Regions:
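Active-site nucleophile and cofactor-binding loops and adjacent substrate-binding regions
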Residues: 1-2, 22-26, 55-74, 96-100, ...
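Cofactor-binding active-site loop characterized by glycine-rich and histidine/acidic residues
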Residues: 2-116, 253, 258, 267-268, ...
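Glycine-rich ThDP/TPP pyrophosphate-binding loop and its adjacent helix/strand module
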Residues: 62-218, 224-232, 236-241, 361-472
Length: 540
């Protein structure tokens, strides 16, 4: 619903002298087209020239690389403060959707903006949607403002000290031009509240606003995906199905999402079936973790589903509200893998060092669907620990083997193949890579390596690590994440004063952006061939 508003913004204001900050950047595509980057949207060969998010390296019209939500007002406050310190007079504009207002940082920014007493224009794009429907008390006030055309005396924005202007026809360019012209060069922090329609102008998007948030390449005429993925399994849907069954067995089981209900497999129909046993808190990861801790403390069985990239937003709550208290909430971490989203703002390979180093947390790394659900079954049932489970990779993998049903005896690795000379500890989704390395060593060096599924990211199986000192010269660790602060470093530290050689394989610490998966794996020597060469060089 931001196409018309973006055109009006660029008509009224003088970008980049006047600075525009787009929240999340999902709303910035029209902005990019109007600032010299339309070729990336029209010519397939230029597609990768431009990212899906605002990016200062692309254009002087972009001021931040942004991909997470609720940040634009705070960033704009900073730009306004810097402008005032330097004696500037340009307009500072933050564009934020109503869905993003559910995030705590948005409230913090609005509260600060209300006392700045200077030019700061906040465009609230209210299309009555987040990714799915909005949740939170604030939206009752937005509805009241829409119903009264902005005239209600109960006005959330005014209560914070912000001036306020309502535009009921938020997809009408003349109305928008008039509103923006009215607030241009204002000396006060001002909210321009525009009521828009999500997907305006494209019938399939208007008809299914939630589904089209995730849409893959599609046929323009029909709106149908070019590749039919309807028959493919995915961990999101499987998790939702599992939890819905648990809810029927136990009325204290609660599924929690933070603005992305389908991450945990709760489609509109499943949300309806779950009733009060499903809670979407809006885009508020911090609150979601604290809520889960509170539910667990009260005797409930909460399961919070979240993408790896968004776990970063709730570190303090994981540490303070959950783990210090030791409450048995469950967190399922999705897309924690190098094979997931590949843009710099949505990387999924920083969660291992972040989560696994918090005391009291049990962080599990299943290797396949069967092991994942065995761990999830135990995690929901147990009452001793906060448990996080790293959902294994992007694609569903199945194994025909028996998996444990009780993980209460912590930090016990599973030796799946006993060998000698080389021991491979292949964590989670990289278990298959460990199997491939084992086969490569047999083929090329005649070494029958030991293969181990560590299962626990958060601790060491010291008896097994001691056992490996007999008959093994090299221990290899494989992890689907950054090495710094990760699983492999714990193993290397354990063997530090011994004769054991330890090779850690994972990703170097960097903000990789729009990478080719195969190229990134090779750059980090994460192929069976490269690792086998390294091992052969040591064995001689």
């Amino acid at each position: 619903g931001m196409v018309e508003a973006t055109i009006a913004l660029h008509y009224v204001f003088n970008s980049p002298t006047d600075k525009m900050v787009y929240d999340v950047s999902h709303q910035s595509y029209t902005h990019k087209m109007l600032t010299g980057r339309k070729g990336a949207f029209l010519n397939p060969e230029d597609y990768d020239v431009v990212s899906g998010y605002t990016n200062p390296r692309e254009s002087g019209h972009d001021f931040f690389t942004i991909g997470h939500t609720s940040t634009s007002v705070s960033l704009a406050c900073g730009l306004a403060k810097a402008r005032d310190l330097k004696g500037g007079h340009e307009n500072i504009i933050a564009v934020i959707g109503d869905g993003s207002l559910s995030g705590g940082e948005a409230y913090e920014g609005l509260s600060n903006a209300g006392e700045m007493g200077t030019n700061l224009i906040i465009v609230v794009n209210d299309n009555e949607m987040s990714i799915a429907e909005n949740h939170g008390g604030l939206y009752q006030n937005l509805k009241e403002l829409r119903d009264t055309e902005g005239r209600s005396s109960c006005n959330f924005f005014r209560s914070l000290g912000l001036d306020y202007l309502y535009v009921g026809e938020g997809n009408d360019i003349p109305s928008l031009v008039a509103a923006f012209a009215k607030v241009k060069d204002t000396s006060r922090p001002t909210v321009v509240h525009i009521h828009t329609q999500k997907g305006k102008g494209y019938a399939p998007a208007e008809a299914d606003r939630e589904e089209f948030h995730w849409e893959m390449p599609f046929d323009l005429e029909t709106g149908k995906p070019k590749v039919d993925c309807s028959g493919m399994e995915d961990y999101h849907s499987l998790t939702g199905k599992f939890l819905l069954e648990k809810m029927k067995e136990d009325h204290t089981v609660v599924a929690i999402s933070s603005g992305t209900p389908t991450v945990i497999g709760f489609t509109p129909e499943r949300r309806k079936q779950a009733g009060r046993q499903f809670v979407d808190v809006g885009i508020a990861e911090e609150h979601a973790v604290a809520l889960a801790s509170g539910i667990a403390a009260g005797g409930g069985r909460p399961v919070y589903g979240v993408y790896s990239t968004f776990v970063q937003r709730c570190y303090d709550q994981l540490s303070q509200d959950l783990c210090i208290n030791g409450n048995p909430a469950v967190i399922t971490v999705f897309m924690g893998t190098v094979a997931g989203m590949n843009d710099v703002t949505h990387l999924g390979f920083f969660d291992i060092p972040l989560i696994s180093n918090i005391p009291n947390m049990v962080y599990l790394a299943p290797t396949c669907s069967e092991e994942y659900f065995a761990m999830l079954e135990w995690a929901v049932r147990q009452t001793e620990y906060p448990v996080a489970i790293r959902v294994p990779g992007a694609a569903v993998v199945h194994r025909k083997e028996e998996f444990d049903t009780d993980y209460s005896e912590l930090n016990r690795y599973k030796m799946t193949a006993r060998g000698e000379t080389v021991a491979i500890l292949a964590l989670g989704a990289f278990y298959d890579l460990g199997q491939a390395l084992k086969n490569k060593l047999r083929e090329e060096s005649g070494v029958e390596a030991t293969l181990i599924n560590p299962r626990y990211i958060t601790g060491l199986d010291e008896p097994m690590l001691e056992e490996l000192k007999v008959g093994h010269r090299i221990v290899v660790t494989l992890e689907d994440g950054v090495l710094d602060g990760g699983f492999g470093e714990k193993i290397a530290r354990y063997y530090g004063n011994s004769e054991m050689r330890v090779l850690n394989y994972g990703l170097r610490k960097e903000f990789a952006d729009r990478y080719n998966l195969d190229e990134l794996m090779k750059a980090n020597r994460l192929t069976d061939k490269q690792m086998a060469e390294d091992i052969a060089g040591i064995l001689g």
